[in-house]
């Protein structure tokens, strides 16, 4: 481990002790060496005893910097793992850091472009439009067409810093998991691995560009979502150049009302967009927090969303989509047995799970939700309740569904912020029913046959040979089975003969012994004993020699 890694480790440890996070471990869970380690840093005391544990964790992550801030933000969406107070505190973490030097930004941009900024852009603004932990954004005008663009560039050395912190996190998570044991609900190693995959994906701006292009193409003819144009020839791993957009932040409700935006239509379109991305395209924006969503300034009576930052996208398998659709439909039909069966059929809970107990646990959690009108029931909280219940029965974690549940909570919160009377069920029900109809109807059967047709067309010429080989193998197996049966019968015959002779010999020996002890004629006794000995010898020789069939 390098000196810098040791120094960073000390910084993290000092911060954890400063906020008293070591006290979160129950005394019976603390390692034996814990008091000794704590004593070595006796001068670092908990300076925030007046604050709750959740608030202290939030402050510690804020102090530790961008990588930990992003981890906290991700944890705030894992409500299947955290209680509401912890999730609420971590959700308040802000990924805002001072901008880095514009000279470094220029150097990084020119390195990626292999050209000077002045040769490609006019009016490059050294003052960034936004600055975050991974990248910052500058505005400019393209020389080639005169259009306004923004350039998103990664921070210098950000990859090395993130990888170093991730390595330290992994070591800490492994240690914490050993301390807490397998039954712990938080599962630190799993959380850190999920976070590692997410944040490393955000470091590849070329991937973000390709995601944005795909999402834009999916909604080219849509009047509900607009994705800015990506200049693919100017986008690389550490730089992305895109069309500059002008809109109203979705969180700026007063500005939306001031321009007369149709908030009811906007809220309904948000839900429709989510289900369209999931069920039609199987490609959904999974980072739809307010900072990434804007609303058009033109046509406020027919508003549309503007989506930015496609670094985190989600996809689902057909099994996932069926699980999602059938679970929602079963929930609103109060069919808790079907919900339990779906988890079993998907292979996410063990086949040895007590299905009756699982069904009852789901019912206990879900039934109280029907005390409120259908329009007020949250899809995200339904999924959350199912995840939490299933985890009690050792459900295998499905990262793609956790990502979807997080996005669904964002969409619902956004929709009800825009229009509190939004009826999520009535808006989403047609999408779910249409998708299910496509999965089980005649057209679905024909589509599956059509998709498998190339495979069968390729295998068809091999069919006669496969049939011949199987018949040949069958005959060979039949012959082998007959040989084994003959051997078995022969073995049984010899075994029966041997047993018969040995038992008979035992009878003669017993009779001879009785005659001898009763002082009966000596010759009769010797005859019985001799006959018994002879029969025993014949029986022993008649034993099957080969016990292996």
Swiss-Prot record:
Keyword ATP-binding applies: yes
Q: What is its main location?
A: membrane
Q: Which residues cross the membrane?
A: 498-517, 521-540
**Record InterPro entries:** ABC1_dom (IPR004147), Kinase-like_dom_sf (IPR011009), UbiB (IPR010232), UbiB_bact (IPR045308), UbiB_kinase (IPR050154)
* One GO term describing the cellular component: plasma membrane
Q: Provide any one GO MF term from the record.
A: protein kinase activity
According to its UniProt record, in which pathway does this protein act? Answer: Cofactor biosynthesis; ubiquinone biosynthesis [regulation]
A biological process (GO) of this protein is: ubiquinone biosynthetic process
Which topology term describes how it sits in the membrane?
A: Multi-pass membrane protein
- Which keywords appear in this protein's UniProt record, sorted alphabetically? ATP-binding, Cell inner membrane, Cell membrane, Kinase, Membrane, Nucleotide-binding, Transferase, Transmembrane, Transmembrane helix, Ubiquinone biosynthesis
Describe the location of the Protein kinase domain by residue ranges: 123-501
The compartments listed are: Cell inner membrane
Residues annotated as binding ATP? 129-137, 152
What's the Enzyme Commission number for this chain? Answer: 2.7.-.-
Source domain of life: Bacteria
Q: Which residues form the active site?
A: 287
What role is this protein assigned?
Is probably a protein kinase regulator of UbiI activity which is involved in aerobic coenzyme Q (ubiquinone) biosynthesis.
Give the similarity note: Belongs to the ABC1 family. UbiB subfamily.
Kindly provide the name given to this protein in its UniProt entry. Answer: Probable protein kinase UbiB
- What organism, scientifically named, is this protein from? Shewanella denitrificans (strain OS217 / ATCC BAA-1090 / DSM 15013)
Q: What is the lineage of its organism?
A: Bacteria, Pseudomonadati, Pseudomonadota, Gammaproteobacteria, Alteromonadales
């Amino acid at each position: 481990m390098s000196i810098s890694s040791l120094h960073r480790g000390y910084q993290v440890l000092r911060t954890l002790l400063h906020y008293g996070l070591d006290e979160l471990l129950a005394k019976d869970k603390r390692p034996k060496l814990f008091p000794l380690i704590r004593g070595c840093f006796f001068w670092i005391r908990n300076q925030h005893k007046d604050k709750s544990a959740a608030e202290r964790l939030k402050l510690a992550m804020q102090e530790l910097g961008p990588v930990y801030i992003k981890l906290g933000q991700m944890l705030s969406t894992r409500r299947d793992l955290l209680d509401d107070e912890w999730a609420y505190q971590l959700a308040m973490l802000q990924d805002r850091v001072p901008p880095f030097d514009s000279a470094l930004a220029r150097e990084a941009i020119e390195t990626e472009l292999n050209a000077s900024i002045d040769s490609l852009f006019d009016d490059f603004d050294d003052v960034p439009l936004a600055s975050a932990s991974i990248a910052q954004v500058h505005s400019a005008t393209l020389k080639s067409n005169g259009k306004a663009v923004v350039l998103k560039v990664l921070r210098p050395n950000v990859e090395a810093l993130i990888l170093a912190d991730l390595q330290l996190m992994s070591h800490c998570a492994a240690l914490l998991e050993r301390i807490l044991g397998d039954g712990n609900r938080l599962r630190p190693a799993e959380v850190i691995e999920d976070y590692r995959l997410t944040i490393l994906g955000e470091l590849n701006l070329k991937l973000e560009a390709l995601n944005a292009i795909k999402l834009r193409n999916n909604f080219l003819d849509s009047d509900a979502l607009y994705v800015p144009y990506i200049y693919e020839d100017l986008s690389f791993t550490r730089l992305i150049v895109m069309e500059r957009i002008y809109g109203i932040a979705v969180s700026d409700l007063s500005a939306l009302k001031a321009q007369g935006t149709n908030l009811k239509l906007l809220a309904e379109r948000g839900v429709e967009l989510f289900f369209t991305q999931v069920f039609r395209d199987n490609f959904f924006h999974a980072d739809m927090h307010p900072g990434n969503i804007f609303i058009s300034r033109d046509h406020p009576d027919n508003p549309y969303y503007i989506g930015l930052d496609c670094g985190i996208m989600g996809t689902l398998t057909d099994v996932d989509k069926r699980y999602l659709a059938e679970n929602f439909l079963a929930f609103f039909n109060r069919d808790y047995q079907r919900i339990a069966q779906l988890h079993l059929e998907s292979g996410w809970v063990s086949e040895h799970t007590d299905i009756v107990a699982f069904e009852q646990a789901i019912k206990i959690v879900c039934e109280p939700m029907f005390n409120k009108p259908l329009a007020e029931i949250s899809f995200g909280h339904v999924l959350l309740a199912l995840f939490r219940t299933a985890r009690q029965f050792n459900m295998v974690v499905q990262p793609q569904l956790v990502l979807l549940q997080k996005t669904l909570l964002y969409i619902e919160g956004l929709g009800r912020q825009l229009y509190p009377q939004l009826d999520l069920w009535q808006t989403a029900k047609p999408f779910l029913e249409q998708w299910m109809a496509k999965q089980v109807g005649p057209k679905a059967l024909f589509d599956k046959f059509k998709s498998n047709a190339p495979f069968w067309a390729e295998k068809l010429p091999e069919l006669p040979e496969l049939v011949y080989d199987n018949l040949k193998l069958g005959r060979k197996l039949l012959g082998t089975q007959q040989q084994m049966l003959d051997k078995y019968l022969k073995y049984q015959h010899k075994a029966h003969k041997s047993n018969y002779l040995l038992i008979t010999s035992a009878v003669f020996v017993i009779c001879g012994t009785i005659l001898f002890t009763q002082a009966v004629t000596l010759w009769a006794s010797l005859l019985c004993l001799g006959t018994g000995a002879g029969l025993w010898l014949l029986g022993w020789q008649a034993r099957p020699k080969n016990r292996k069939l």
